[in-house]
């Protein structure tokens, strides 16, 4: 089962993005020919979801490298560093963004050696400089495209491991969108649901709308309908009542950053669901690639939380819904403590509490 749309792709020296701001009303694509357009798309949620942001950042960096100056290796190197810095500042919470920037920097370091050094230098003759920089650009584009291909394969492995947790007939609650729209393809949390369906299991999805930007209503419901997966849309405030009624068998969410103790930053409202799930003995599963795990962080207290514009709460699709001048607090994410999470599903297998040891075992076991 594969999605009938493309979230992100490299086409003819440009980055093709499905405009998720236009969904569900219109399925349209943006062709970004300048890296600034990719940056804007990341910031304004045209492309969103941690894995998709990572791939978009890599492609944006590769795109920007195509127009870096050829005057000297030093100018090229300085321009590349500035380019990476711009993308690293695009959104602060998504670990995959920083992972992608770091990986593109490594690729650059491996191929940028005009004078047999990875340091910025202007020592090489003109023609040799041009050949070297052309090779660097080619390598960066290839790396970004490789990351997109790897992401789809990783998501399929997440689905393979995660679907064993899903029994036939399960009723699954989702939050935000962690599907093909949030990745280069297939999805993390929705990838588990796809894999369960491919294994012949029947499932029913309850998608909560996910205020304030309505990713559940606009994106998850749209994506599941495209796949003919049964989905029922609910408001965020209905989730607890469904659990009380015994109508939810498990909760499946993605993640934007995970600390080594399992504390998980995900779309605002995830923590609320986790507390409700614990009160009703409903398992909550997090599906995310290993690249989302920040091994430098010992707990979720260290995860930076992005705050979004007030307009996201004050308006819906441009229509005001609150009195002018009211104060607004709009964190994009919250952090769910690891002890509320029943399992973290990765491409290397499933980790369970306590996560410090189980996640480390997955890292050690995976190439």
From Swiss-Prot:
Keyword Nucleotidyltransferase attached: no
EC id: 5.3.1.23
Single GO MF annotation: S-methyl-5-thioribose-1-phosphate isomerase activity
Active site, per annotation: 256
Keyword Aminoacyl-tRNA synthetase assigned: no
Pathways per UniProt: Amino-acid biosynthesis; L-methionine biosynthesis via salvage pathway; L-methionine from S-methyl-5-thio-alpha-D-ribose 1-phosphate: step 1/6
Family as reported in the entry's similarity comment: Belongs to the eIF-2B alpha/beta/delta subunits family. MtnA subfamily.
HAMAP family, sorted: Salvage_MtnA
Name of this protein: Methylthioribose-1-phosphate isomerase
């Amino acid at each position: 089962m594969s999605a009938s749309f493309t979230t992100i792709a490299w086409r003819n020296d440009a980055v093709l993005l499905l405009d998720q701001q236009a969904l569900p009303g219109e399925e349209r694509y943006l062709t970004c020919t300048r890296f600034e357009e990719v940056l804007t798309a990341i910031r304004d949620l045209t492309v969103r979801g941690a894995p998709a942001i990572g791939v978009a950042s890599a492609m944006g960096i590769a795109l920007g490298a195509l127009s870096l100056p050829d005057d000297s290796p030093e100018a090229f190197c300085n321009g590349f560093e500035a380019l990476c810095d711009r993308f690293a500042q695009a959104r602060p919470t998504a670990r995959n963004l920083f992972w992608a920037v770091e990986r593109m920097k490594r690729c650059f370091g491996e191929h940028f050696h005009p004078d047999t050094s990875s340091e910025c230098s202007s020592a090489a003759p003109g023609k040799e400089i041009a050949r070297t920089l052309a090779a660097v650009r080619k390598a960066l584009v290839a790396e970004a495209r490789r990351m997109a291909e790897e992401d789809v394969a990783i998501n399929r492995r997440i689905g393979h491991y995660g679907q064993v947790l899903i029994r036939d007939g399960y009723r699954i609650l989702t939050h935000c969108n962690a599907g093909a729209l949030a990745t280069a393809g297939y999805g993390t949390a929705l990838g588990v649901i796809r894999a369960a369906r491919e294994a012949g299991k029947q499932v029913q999805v309850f998608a909560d709308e996910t205020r304030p930007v309505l990713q559940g209503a606009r994106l998850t419901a749209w994506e599941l309908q495209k796949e003919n997966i049964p989905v029922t849309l609910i408001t965020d405030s209905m989730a607890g009542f469904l659990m009380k009624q015994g109508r939810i068998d498990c909760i499946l969410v993605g993640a934007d950053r995970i600390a080594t103790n399992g504390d998980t930053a995900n779309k605002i409202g995830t923590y609320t669901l986790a507390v409700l799930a614990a009160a009703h003995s409903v398992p909550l599963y997090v599906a995310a690639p290993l690249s989302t795990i920040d091994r430098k962080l010992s707990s979720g207290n260290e995860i930076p939380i992005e705050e979004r514009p007030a307009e996201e709460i004050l308006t819906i699709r441009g229509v005001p819904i609150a009195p002018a001048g009211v104060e607004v607090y709009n964190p994009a994410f919250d952090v769910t403590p690891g002890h509320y999470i029943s399992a973290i599903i990765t491409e290397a297998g499933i980790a369970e509490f306590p996560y410090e040891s189980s996640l480390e075992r997955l890292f050690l076991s995976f190439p």
